[in-house]
Amino acid sequence: RSLSRYLTFGLVFMAVLIVAFPLYRLREPTLRADATALQLQQYQKTGGELFATNCAACHGLQGNGGIGPTLNAKEFLTATTDNQIAMLITGGISGSIMSAWGLDYGGSFTDEQIQQLVTYLRSLEPNAPSVPDWQKGKQDS
């Protein structure tokens, strides 16, 4: 009698799992997409704060150029990959005032902070103006 009780409990438990697992699988992509969107928002916000504090003095508050190139330019943003932008921030540009910001190169930014900056710059892309001579910055134009 007690064996049949355990078998019944086991079968009911298995039936619950069989029903619950597909329901969880249906919901999982939505949860993952929500988490990704939330992380993207947070990266954009933090990247914007990092940019304002560390980059705006040379590149302008909205990335519209200064003594450094215009980063909020359609030409720059469409011509470079995320990895290229990250490498420019990490290692700097030899022979220019753009110093290295990555920890491995003596800078102060972690890889995550660099990714946050890249995410912020990418958030400017949909409304980026066309600036054919974006490399010059404002002082050279």
Show which residues each predicted segment covers:
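Glycine-centered loop/turn positions within well-structured domains
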Residues: 53, 69, 96
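Sec/Tat-exported extracytoplasmic proteins
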Residues: 54-55, 59-62, 92-93, 121-128
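Flexible coil segments in periplasmic/lumen-exposed cytochrome c-class electron-transfer proteins
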Residues: 1-4, 30-37, 96-141
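Generic alpha-helical secondary structure signal
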Residues: 41, 45, 83, 112-115
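Gly/Gly-Pro-rich "capping" loops immediately C-terminal to redox-active cysteine motifs
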Residues: 48, 60, 64-91, 100, ...
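His/Cys-centered metal/cofactor-coordination and adjacent catalytic loops
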Residues: 17-43, 56, 61-76
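Mature N-terminal segment immediately following signal peptide/propeptide cleavage
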Residues: 47-54
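N-terminal Sec-pathway targeting helices
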Residues: 1-13
